[in-house]
């Protein structure tokens, strides 16, 4: 399987970056072909422009060169993995902007849907699982991404995995890396 791994963190040497590397290694070890999209590292601009807004009157929309390049990258893969820290109970703005600009009408929803077989979101959380459950954040974030994005765009096999305690010291980072593999 060809898998697009999208990382959304400003520091490549962060735990999010290390988890991304572990995911890439795990995919290669499983015989899958992984392609990395490091949104910050590549300088992706998350701001949508009029050129990239959905065109509700046409199914033959032309997008900016930057977005068309991302669409092609998205479409040449069979699966997608999003790796990101959870900030303010959601994913980073750069990832939201990437989805807004690239997962566009008649690309990911509308007259056409994504053809990806599977999608996985890996969210790194500083808080523990009981904190998320107590306030309902766990189901809210999962519903937003799995149902509101993956399923809405035609990816029936989508799931969300939390890696809790990402800012805990000691052995926790090593345990999270092991879990990611």
Predicted features and spans:
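N-terminal beta1-alpha1-beta2 submodule of the flavodoxin-like/Rossmannoid cofactor-binding fold
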Residues: 1-107, 170-181
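A short small-residue
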Residues: 1-3, 124-127, 161-167
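Hydrophobic/aromatic residues located in beta-strands of well-ordered beta-sheets
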Residues: 3, 34, 119, 157-158
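Glycine-rich phosphate/pyrophosphate-binding loop and the adjoining helix
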Residues: 29, 135-139, 144-181
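Generic secondary-structure boundary/loop-capping signal
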Residues: 41-45, 111, 152, 160
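Short, surface-exposed, charge-dense and proline/glycine-enriched linear segments
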Residues: 60-74, 113-116, 137-145, 162-164
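Short, conserved beta-strand edge motifs with alternating hydrophobic and charged residues
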Residues: 83, 121-123, 160
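Short, glycine-/small-residue-rich phosphate/pyrophosphate-handling segment
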Residues: 108-156
């Amino acid at each position: 399987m060809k898998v697009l791994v999208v990382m959304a963190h400003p520091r490549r040497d962060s735990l999010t970056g290390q988890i991304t590397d572990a995911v890439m290694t795990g995919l290669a070890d499983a015989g899958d072909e992984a392609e990395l999209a490091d949104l910050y590292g590549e300088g992706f601009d998350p701001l949508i422009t009029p050129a990239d807004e959905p065109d509700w009157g046409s199914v033959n929309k032309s997008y900016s060169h930057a977005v068309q390049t991302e669409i092609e990258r998205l479409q040449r893969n069979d699966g997608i993995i999003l790796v990101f820290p959870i900030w303010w109970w959601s994913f980073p703005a750069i990832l939201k902007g990437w989805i807004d600009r690239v997962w566009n009408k008649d690309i990911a929803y509308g007259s056409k849907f994504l053809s990806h077989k599977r999608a996985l979101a890996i969210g790194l959380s500083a808080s523990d699982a009981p904190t998320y459950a107590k306030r309902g954040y766990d189901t809210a974030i999962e519903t937003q991404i799995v149902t509101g994005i993956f399923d809405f765009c035609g990816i029936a096999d989508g799931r969300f995995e939390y890696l809790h305690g990402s800012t805990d010291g000691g052995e926790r980072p090593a345990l999270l890396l092991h879990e990611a593999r």
